[in-house]
């Protein structure tokens, strides 16, 4: 038994006591410490080795305040000092002593006699993390037997993880675009010319994430299609979970859909063109708002069902019919003065943007995605996105 399946902010004393009652042993994802770490250089190096070994392998919980014999917890030895100050001290040590930095969360769980400190280390998708304290330059990994220093071959494997994930993400996008363009989407689309948005958790290629199907099939607000306030129809399918924009099942066509794959990857597709005097137009400003706003919502929806960051966000346009980019803001009466160039290819696949955490708001999301949005504008002949003011603020509406 471990605690990783329980959100850190929901862990209570009963969960702590269950570890003792079930004699849950130390593994590659859980380590017990009787006392917190001291203040000497040796103590710092031990702490950094412990947390970096978790980050470089599978992630896990470092639990301070357990007396254990041969890795089996026997009793709690609660921390009785200022737990906020101690957590801040340890988090500061991790920030200053490792490169690159790791993702670390902490919680003090109240128990009889004091607190148990839990440091939750996320599995890193940018390994390996090395100890830079006093120029140590050492790497650590972890197995069921404890932490160890990886050999050359193991280090090489760690160094290639991030590029491998990038390649898998791009390959997934390419495969999906081919299928959608050929008519092999999970629904029959109303239009062939579409915006395709992918949100790819880095964990997606490790394992299939267990999706909460029973909850999803009752939730019309999460993972809803672009351009809709909520889903109009929901369906469990072979690939995972499908949300659709059309509530009329007899119509059998969809303007937009969201496919949540079992690994946690999300694909959101929406009709792209607007038409004026019969000419198909790409309303760039509205497309940019759709990308930023929906990417933010999808990342937050993923986090809510336990599929954690980092996430790669990718946006693409499928433009089977020749169209013209238009840079008018919604409601701008002089839209015909805001024309850009014509499309010159059937597909635009813009560069991915990496998020280490789900953005708190559309502003933060759009600013992070500025390079992608600029690339979209440049595809239509504009030097940069027209959705940002001179101070960098993203224009969300008028």
State what each model feature region is.
Residues 1-62, 67-70, 152-398:
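Bergerat-fold GHKL/Histidine-kinase-like ATPase
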Residues 4-11, 74-134:
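Divalent-cation
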Residues 25-27, 101, 114-116, 136, ...:
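Sequence-level motif detector for i,i+2 pairs with an aromatic at +2
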Residues 33-38, 72-80, 134-146, 277-281:
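Short hinge/gating elements
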Residues 79-93, 136-148, 217-225:
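A signal for specific C-terminal beta-sheet/loop modules enriched in small/flexible residues
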Residues 95-110, 130-152, 341-368:
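Hydrophobic transmembrane alpha-helix bundles
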Residues 105-184:
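Hydrophobic, helix-rich cores of sensory/ligand-binding and other regulatory modules
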């Amino acid at each position: 038994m471990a605690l990783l399946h329980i959100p850190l902010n929901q862990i209570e004393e009963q969960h702590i006591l269950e570890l003792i009652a079930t004699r849950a042993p130390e593994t590659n994802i859980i380590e017990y410490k009787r006392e917190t770490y001291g203040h000497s250089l040796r103590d710092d190096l031990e702490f950094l080795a412990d947390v970096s070994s978790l980050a470089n392998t599978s992630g896990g919980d470092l639990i301070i305040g357990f007396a254990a014999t041969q890795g089996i917890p026997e009793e709690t030895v609660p921390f009785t000092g200022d737990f906020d100050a101690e957590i801040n001290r340890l988090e500061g040590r991790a920030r200053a002593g490792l490169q690159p930095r790791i993702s670390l969360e902490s919680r003090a769980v109240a128990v009889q006699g004091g607190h148990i400190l839990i440091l939750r280390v996320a599995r890193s998708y940018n390994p390996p993390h090395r100890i830079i304290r006093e120029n140590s330059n050492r790497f650590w990994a972890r197995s069921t037997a404890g932490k160890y220093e990886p050999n050359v071959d193991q280090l090489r494997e760690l160094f290639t993880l991030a590029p491998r994930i990038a390649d898998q993400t791009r390959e997934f996008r390419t495969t999906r675009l081919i299928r959608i363009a050929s008519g092999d989407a999970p629904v029959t689309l109303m239009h062939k010319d579409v915006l395709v948005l992918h949100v790819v958790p880095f964990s997606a290629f490790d394992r299939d994430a267990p999706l909460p199907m029973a909850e999803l099939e009752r939730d019309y607000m999460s993972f809803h299609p672009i351009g809709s306030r909520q889903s109009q129809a929901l369906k469990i399918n072979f690939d995972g979970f499908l949300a659709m924009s059309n509530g009329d099942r007899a119509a059998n066509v969809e303007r937009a859909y969201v496919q949540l794959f079992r690994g946690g990857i999300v694909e959101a597709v929406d009709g792209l063109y607007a038409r004026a005097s019969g000419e198909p137009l790409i309303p760039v400003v509205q497309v940019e708002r759709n990308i930023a706003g929906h990417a933010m919502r999808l990342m937050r929806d993923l986090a809510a069902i336990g599929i954690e960051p980092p996430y790669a966000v990718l946006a693409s346009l499928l433009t089977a019919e020749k169209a013209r980019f238009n840079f008018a803001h919604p409601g701008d009466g002089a839209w015909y003065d805001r024309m850009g160039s014509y499309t010159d290819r059937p597909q635009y696949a813009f560069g991915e943007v990496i998020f280490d955490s789900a953005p708190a708001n559309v502003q933060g999301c759009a600013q992070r995605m500025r390079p992608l949005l600029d690339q979209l504008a440049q595809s239509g002949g504009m030097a940069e996105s027209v959705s940002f003011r001179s101070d960098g603020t993203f224009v969300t509406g008028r």
